[in-house]
Amino acid sequence: MQRSPLEKASVISKLFFSWTRPILRKGYRQRLELSDIYQIPSADSADNLSEKLEREWDRELVSKKNPKLINALRRCFFWRFMFYGIILYLGEVTKAVQPLLLGRIIASYDPDNEAERSIAIYLGIGLCLLFIVRTLLLHPAIFGLHHIGMQMRIAMFSLIYKKTLKLSSRVLDKISIGQLVSLLSNNLNKFDEGLALAHFVWIAPLQVTLLMGLLWDLLQASAFCGLAFLIVLALFQAGLGRMMMKYRDQRAGKINERLVITSEMIENIQSVKAYCWEEAMEKMIENLRQTELKLTRKAAYVRYFNSSAFFFSGFFVVFLSVLPYALIKGIVLRRIFTTISFCIVLRMAVTRQFPWAVQTWYDSLGAINKIQDFLQKQEYKTLEYNLTTTEVVMENVTAFWEEGFGELFEKAKQNNDRKISNGDNSLFFSNFSLLGTPVLKDISFKIERGQLLAVAGSTGAGKTSLLMMIMGELEPSEGKIKHSGRISFCSQFSWIMPGTIKENIIFGVSYDEYRYRSVIKACQLEEDISKFAEKDNIVLGEGGIQLSGGQRARISLARAVYKDADLYLLDSPFGYLDVLTEKEIFESCVCKLMANKTRILVTSKMEHLKKADKILILHEGSSYFYGTFSELQNLRPDFSSKLMGYDSFDQFSAERRNSILTETLRRFSLEGDATVSWNETKKQSFKQTGEFGDKRKNSILNPINSIRKFSIVQKTPLQMNGIEEDSDEPLERRLSLVPDSEQGEAILPRSNVINTGPTFQRRRRQSVLNLMTRSSVNQGQSIHRKTATSTRKMSLAPQANLTEMDIYSRRLSQDSGLEISEEINEDDLKECFFDDVESIPTVTTWNTYLRYITIHKSLIFVLIWCLVIFLAEVAASLVVLWLLKETPPQDSGNSTKGANNSYAVIITSTSSYYVFYIYVGVADTLLALGLFRGLPLVHTLITVSKILHHKMLHSVLQAPMSTLNTLKAGGILNRFSKDMAILDDLLPLTIFDFIQLLLIVIGAVAVVSVLQPYIFLATVPVIAAFIILRAYFLHTSQQLKQLESEGRSPIFTHLVTSLKGLWTLRAFGRQPYFETLFHKALNLHTANWFLYLSTLRWFQMRIEMIFVIFFIAVTFISILTTGEGEGTVGIILTLAMNIMSTLQWAVNSSIDVDSLMRSVSRVFKFIDMPTEDSKPTKSVKPSKDGQLSKVMIIENQYVKKDDIWPSGGQMTVKDLTAKYTDGGNAILENISFSISPGQRVGLLGRTGSGKSTLLSAFLRLLNTEGEIQIDGVSWDSITLQQWRKAFGVIPQKVFIFSGTFRKNLDPYGQWNDQEIWKVADEVGLRSVIEQFPGKLDFVLVDGGNVLSHGHKQLICLARSVLSKAKILLLDEPSAHLDPITYQIIRRTLKQAFADCTVILSEHRIEAMLECQRFLVIEENKVRQYDSIQKLLSEKSLFQQAISSSDPLKLFPHRNSSKHKSRSKIAALQEETEEEVQETRL
């Protein structure tokens, strides 16, 4: 960044903003880079400003019981704020004085007032000087206020960020990330924009008082008629504003509904294409868009009338002020023209400035109070440590994640009494003692220096909470903790900060080469680092998106190990690693490298327990066992069930085995009933309305929710570049059925009840604490794949006795949750994170305007219509002027024109009624014409928006995956949310305003030029100068805006990154470093924003200077050339003053239009995306086996219905090569093999070897070369849709969209209910669907959050059965399944797909053993393609993976279908026992 010229600028340069010229010149000539931006003045640096405000806020906290943030702000900024306010007032006063001089000039032309004629020229000079003074006062004042607003925002940003790093985990649990981002973006922007308006809360009343005094002098009491009209108008506009908000609120629900489905479509675009659902999704979204646009039109019409009311009001104000006076006393012309000028200023003060100022104060004070509440939240307390301590001791420790359980108990009791009095006593007192269940109960252990403690337990047992308590994140309510305080921590979910691999591992600790190399080697990172060209200096993006899940996990572990500490806390560090890597790291790192350190390792692996010095097994928060492994075997023979999280199967009823949903439903209805009577947001159990549910305001992390019958866990895997597709799914802990998610960790990512209300359900806000406990992958947007939707898993841990009261207590506690923002528009918040670096031109091209205008033929006619009406208006005014000129001087009538082509035709007292008629007649005509002009324009522009949305949606759905892989999901969604909102809401009204203002100016210039042709000569250069200046400024301003927008993203990204790694940050004590990074991001944004404000002010000032020169020219031309006739001078000068203010407004409007048209450019960019080549690329030829008839029938469109192809499911793959993008590396090379009809083939390979890529290649979702044939038909000879319909797909990332069960199973509506129920029976879905009200018509929302992951898999199975597919592709179908659902799926696969070809990519060995052949993929190629016997006899990956099991024992399973079927319960029991021995590849 360059040094700012501002530092050396002179006073004159600062006053006229001339110091910005170099950047304006550079921006005009070339594209600006970040290096071209000037450094910020030291007074604006985040360090200085935050220190200043922090000091004052600390003073406020120390000195008062009730500290006020506004007092701290006042002490920092008040005097400068008032100084600029006074300057602003003086600038505004000049506006009120100008009409007095104008009146005197007009009076000097009165034949009876010859004496004043000589001083007219001096009055003209005085009037021009007033304009110059106004310009020199207003612009510095407005800039100064914007500058103070920016400084206040920076100081508060910093204060909020610092506070966030200090918040206790309990508070973080109650705040969602959306609320925090909203606090920073929505609330604080109010200071930037609003501070310049704030002073009008006192300036406007003073201005009105002054003007009314001056008008009283002119018109006496009748002046108040005009004021009364303006007050009524202001109230009318407020009413219209309220009506508009009503429509917009209704519309918000519809927009949310559309965006949810659009978002689901974008995130699952691969599945949409695999299922051939493009047309169905398009139709569904367009139907929602239709309803939304009806409300958009209503809101636009109301806004249009609101805007028009201002334009048309000018005439009536003058008319109502003048008429009573004229009727009673008659009137002289100069009073009329003076009145007109006064009324223009008055109108602005009453209808615009004062209401805006009041709104600004209301918003700003609200924002300050919210921030004040946030700054007073409870902070994290570090424990008191003794550095000489060598052991770790915990004595009788109990802890709660929640506080204030006594109050909750009372509240629940009252609520329960109320329920009993209503006759509903079925719910409570069953487990009342569990209200406020501690997360840890009476835990005691002691480990000496150098010992390894293994902590194990089922999901939600309290393992992570134990580590949190040692770190001080969770405060014990009883008991003692003792350790030295020198801690290192490795989180369960790996956290990567933006920076190099080396910076992530060293993490601010002093660099030691030997230690660093040892850690890299022990954590198995050497090979990974060597693959990168930059080695360990490769810069990792947000969340480390270039890395696989396993690599991220190992870097997080290396960071923890590199720090020299006394105690190492390792929370399931091996979750993402395959068996072999995990074994090596445990041996070399945990056991050898850290041998003399104290370690606490959360694990569920038997091998780790055997090696540990001490074992602590937790169960439901209590210490189930503490001791050595040998003691464990002797004392607790049943430990495996506690460790794994489920007991033996005979505890379950038959009903429970058939459908896990029964318990889920029971949980939902409990929660619904428990909350409905008192919860503000009336959450109800499965009560469907026509709309989807209300917006949720719950925290995501519900600590206590995790201790329930089923732990529902959120996972958001990221699929990466084809190289690491499988790797981002965390492998489960070996002896636990689900990832060991802690309470206070990955709990319901979205609402677990269905809300009913006016708006569609958005994604639930994520509490900050939950953000930390989820995989860092979630926020990272892969370059090549989209982030996956949340998937859920059910643990089989019965834990039945912990459900009702825990959920109830959690719901109660949510009343005390922090509500930072009542209404957070989270889709809008996305713009904080996804700012595409655009390749669109710096200024909107004429081509974009031309395409926009011609996309809907009616728009051209509407624009011509506007022009015709405008010409009629000008013609009318010229006719009136001509009539007036023809009238004899003694009866001279004169006309004038208000800000809207309205006329004030005033005749001397000969006929007051004649005045009245002309006024009303002319005004009515113009009012009608103005309305006719605007409404069709607004209506047509909304239709254009509708067409653009349709075209863009079609383009995205038809685009090839290679194109979509290069785009961020957030970027695509921004086009449908942010840009469509601009096209719907802002653009039509801004274009209307611009056209209206432009026509007013042209009309006024035309009238003036007719009256005084010389003025036309002055007008031409002014308009030319304005066009050149606008073009010159626009190039730079749009680039600065874009850079500012890009600079906003790092601020919010850094906030989210810090929150995800907050526990790690605090464990390593790196808060100051991260505060510095945050300040750097703030300063970068400030540099862009400050420069944008300065250049904008430069432009506004230059425009005003041109107008001042124009006005001086007009004044002197009219004074020197008019001769007799006060009317003409009056009209010319009044209109010239109008032209000044209106043309400036028009210029700003034109810049707004250009800025908004960039959204249109972005939309066109999406519309122009390439489409998939769906037509056959070669003619059909008979294959070698002579299946001529089959091939020929393919050309027939009814081929699918006749079930002729594919008939057997035979597949032949020849030389298949697959790439993700056109110029990318080959992910798979020269793959060749064939599959017999009905055969089952298993895909084997390490994480990231390309198994999922191969399945995508079969579906032609990638760039592929080579050939695949199904039953002799080549993929080149039929359409893409026909080819994909040959496959049934169960993807890794299950896709359930918001809609009914029926829609989800059959979006095209091809099958009747009978057929759907039949298939539901086959796959075991009937019992699931029947338990929902409405059955097939039950509406699923939020990705089907009421279903377990297993049931979603069953829906995918049912889709495949309905599609009559002969080839089934399964990608990790058991990845997140509990044993029961897994057995249902296995059974379904055996029965429903008995005669189908099945290709299976799977991690579970047991599932793979049912395959007849195996395809082993290594290094992008096929290594082996053989039967299981051959693979076991050779040294292969498969053989290594199951070396610990007895191969012979595994063999009977392969042919299990030939065995006589055993009783169902016995079979399930045996199969599930084998799950315990489960091994993963």
Curated annotation (Swiss-Prot):
Membrane topology, record value: Multi-pass membrane protein
Subcellular location field: Apical cell membrane; Early endosome membrane; Cell membrane; Recycling endosome membrane
Recorded GO MF terms: ABC-type transporter activity; ATP binding; ATP hydrolysis activity; ATPase-coupled transmembrane transporter activity; bicarbonate transmembrane transporter activity; chloride channel activity; chloride channel inhibitor activity; chloride transmembrane transporter activity
Domain ABC transporter: start-end pairs: 422-645, 1211-1444
Sequence ranges on the Extracellular membrane side: 99-122, 217-222, 320-339, 880-918, 1012-1013, 1117-1130
TM stretches of this protein: 78-98, 123-146, 196-216, 223-243, 299-319, 340-358, 859-879, 919-939, 991-1011, 1014-1034, 1096-1116, 1131-1151
Record-linked Pfam families: ABC_membrane (PF00664), ABC_tran (PF00005), CFTR_R (PF14396)
Residues annotated with Phosphothreonine modification: 716
Bias kind Basic residues: ranges: 1451-1463
Region (Disordered R region): 653-831
Cross-link (Glycyl lysine isopeptide (Lys-Gly) (interchain with G-Cter in ubiquitin)): 687
Catalytic activity: ATP + H2O + closed Cl(-) channel = ADP + phosphate + open Cl(-) channel; chloride(in) = chloride(out); hydrogencarbonate(in) = hydrogencarbonate(out); ATP + H2O = ADP + phosphate + H(+)
CDD domains in alphabetical order: ABC_6TM_CFTR_D1, ABC_6TM_CFTR_D2, ABCC_CFTR1, ABCC_CFTR2
A cellular-component GO term for this protein: apical plasma membrane
UniProt-listed Enzyme Commission number(s): 5.6.1.6
UniProt subunit comment: Monomer; does not require oligomerization for channel activity. May form oligomers in the membrane. Interacts with SLC26A3, SLC26A6 and NHERF1. Interacts with SHANK2. Interacts with MYO6. Interacts (via C-terminus) with GOPC (via PDZ domain); this promotes CFTR internalization and thereby decreases channel activity. Interacts with SLC4A7 through NHERF1. Found in a complex with MYO5B and RAB11A. Interacts with ANO1. Interacts with SLC26A8. Interacts with AHCYL1; the interaction increases CFTR activity. Interacts with CSE1L.
Name of the protein described by the UniProt record: Cystic fibrosis transmembrane conductance regulator
Organism of origin: Equus caballus (Horse)
